[in-house]
Design a protein with these regions (language model features):
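Short gly/ser/thr-rich secondary-structure transition/capping motifs
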Residues: 102, 135-142, 193-198, 226-227
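Conserved phosphate-binding/catalytic region of the ribokinase-like
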Residues: 1-13, 18-19, 27-37, 53, ...
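Substrate-binding N-lobe of the ribokinase-like
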Residues: 42-117, 134, 328-333
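Conserved beta-alpha-beta core of the PfkB/ribokinase-like small-molecule kinase fold
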Residues: 155-232, 251-253
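Short beta-strand scaffold segments in enzyme catalytic cores
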Residues: 117-121, 252-255
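Conserved phosphate-binding/catalytic loop of the ribokinase/pfkB sugar-kinase fold
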Residues: 108-110, 120-166
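Hydrophobic beta-strand scaffold residues
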Residues: 79, 105, 186-187, 244
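A short, aliphatic-rich alpha-helical micro-motif
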Residues: 149-151, 207-208, 238
């Protein structure tokens, strides 16, 4: 296994995407804009209901940190993804997709069991609501992760969705210890308002004594800090991280370090599907930082890539599209 720039740990999920009405969300007690965990039987029932009344848009490999890692790799970085899939057809599809994107994985990721699935429900306003059956990924532990590449990586990236699993939190703790021992920077995303609302203790455990870079959106930031303004939330989050990035949907993002706080405007696009947008932002931002770009440039690239993800269905772009967008962005920067 060769050295990598980014070492990420997260859930492995296959997405099934549907266009749905707001009424459908209400009828099935699904809180718009959040992720809700469920069991296999309940998800199967929802899937049946979706097939009967809603518009199917397709299947895609997902998982928040995996989407981030794909963006990072497709832009030109090197990456490893630690996860857990079942020894089934979906598990093979999932790992094959990562490998095709140039992301390193390990055979230890495959276990007896069922690969996790996520029903991604996209409402008319492009917001994504998710119902997730974690399957075997709920039991992700250090045993499924090869930590050797972490020792020489530049970044460890952790998704907040892992806050619901005790074994995953233990794996993250081990990863954090290795990262700190080898001078590897740590990035964490809060992932979802539902994680802040229902798994705060788990998030606190992932955050531990702080990180180098924290990603969140405006709602997550204010919920986690129990504040009513982005500015107050930012001030509190800076107590936990050297760099804080708060995304503001179409309005862009606020990025803050010990030296400066900047605000970068959004990019006007026709929003179709918000699924994976924040993940793409994080992957693009990390890639730009890792290649030596400043915060302003990193945020501008991240907004470009994430806005393209929003303008189509599915959590990821085609691999070649990331590279083309980067080329166009660099030409504009040099002009």
């Amino acid at each position: 296994m060769t050295s990598v720039d980014l070492f990420a740990i997260g859930n492995a999920l296959i997405d099934q995407e549907f266009k749905v009405s707001d009424e459908f969300l209400t009828q099935h007690n699904l809180q718009k804009g959040t992720m809700q965990l469920t069991d296999g039987d309940q998800q199967a029932n929802l899937y049946t209901q979706l097939q009967q009344s809603e518009v199917y848009k397709g299947q895609a490999s997902g998982g928040s940190a995996a989407n981030t890692t794909v963006a990072f790799s497709a832009l030109g970085g090197t990456a490893f993804y630690g996860c857990r899939v079942g020894n089934d057809a979906l598990g093979k599809i999932y790992l094959d997709g990562l490998n095709e994107a140039g992301i390193q994985t390990t055979a230890k990721s495959v276990s007896e069991g069922v690969t996790g699935t996520c029903m991604v429900l996209v409402s008319p306003d492009s917001e994504r609501t998710m119902q997730t059956y974690l399957g075997i990924t709920a039991e992700l532990s250090a045993e499924q992760i090869d930590f050797e590449p972490l020792k020489t990586a530049q970044w460890l990236y952790i998704e907040g969705y892992l806050s619901t699993s005790a074994t995953a939190r233990a794996a993250v703790k081990q990863a954090r210890e290795i990262a700190r021992a080898h001078g590897v920077k740590i990035a964490l995303t809060l992932s979802d308002p539902a994680m802040v609302q229902y798994a705060r203790e788990g998030l606190n455990e992932l955050l531990d004594d702080g990180v180098d870079l924290l990603f969140c959106n405006q709602q997550e930031a204010m919920m986690y800090t129990e504040t009513t303004t982005v500015e107050d939330a930012l001030a509190k989050l800076k107590l936990h991280s050297k760099y804080v990035v708060i995304t503001l949907s179409a309005e862009g993002a606020i990025i803050s370090s010990e030296q400066e706080t900047i605000r970068v405007s959004g990019r006007a696009v026709t929003a179709v599907d918000a699924n994976g947008a924040g993940d793409a932002f994080a992957g693009s931002f990390l890639y730009a930082l890792n290649t030596g770009d400043n915060l302003q440039t990193a945020a501008e690239l991240a907004i470009l890539i994430s806005s393209e993800v929003v303008s189509q269905f599915g959590p990821r772009l085609a691999n070649q599209d990331y590279a083309q967008l980067l080329t166009n962005f660099q030409k504009k920067e040099c002009a």
